[in-house]
Amino acid sequence: NWLEEMHRKSEQTKKKIEKHLLDAPQVSTDGTVVTENGHQSYIRNFSILDWVLYESMGSKGHKALSSIPFLQQYAGILVHDHETSLYSYGLDHAECNVHLLRYLVKNGEDTRHIWSSKLHSLLVEMNEYRKRLIGRGEKSLPDKTLQRLEARYDELLEYAKQERKDKPSGFRWATKEETSLLNRLKKYKRNHLLFLHDFNVPFDNNMSERDLRKCKNRQKMSGGFRTEAGKEIYCSLLTITETCKRQGKDLINAFKTILSGASLFA
């Protein structure tokens, strides 16, 4: 059928999209669960402002990631929500701070510790300050300001240690989750604060999350995919349609071009 034909003939167009992504200094990525023949599988996207690529995956782990050509070649910054498997790819990594803000709110509610709200406020303050500088045409933070903000971050982690000693949580599960969160904040401090060092790096991974909504909505409304081939066709078509929208291209003409055997984009 024409969908299978589109999938086959879109290979060159997808390679051009991938090339633009490979040339980008930072790329946002996320994955979502879909069902395939009744079993759990995934769709992952790679997004920048004008280009987006969707990939079908059997699982979310390292083995599946290693089969994605884009990840094998990419040498820039990957922006994601603490997917530790992704740290084997790319040149550097930026953590999504919107997700972190949610975890901090939850931790404060679960443990009643106030360090969470203090760090939440600090991260929001950092982001707002950066936005003001960008609005004034600045390219980076003043060194002294950067040092002050990072020192405040470190102080709050020390404050958290003392607060936990003085006011231990009454719930073992909450204590365990808080320990994991604090370990993450310490180990991945640089990745969470990379947006302060490089103004091209986003504060969050919202772009990639938005680009996955169609996949999530399809799963809710239509259910999963019957076959792996069907999921791959869907990813190809979504790659073409979503990129065409970003580029302001007419979809009908774009489909005609691909079905004629030609490719889109330079």
What function would you assign to each model-found segment?
Residues 1-266:
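Catalytic center-proximal scaffold of phosphoryl-transfer enzymes
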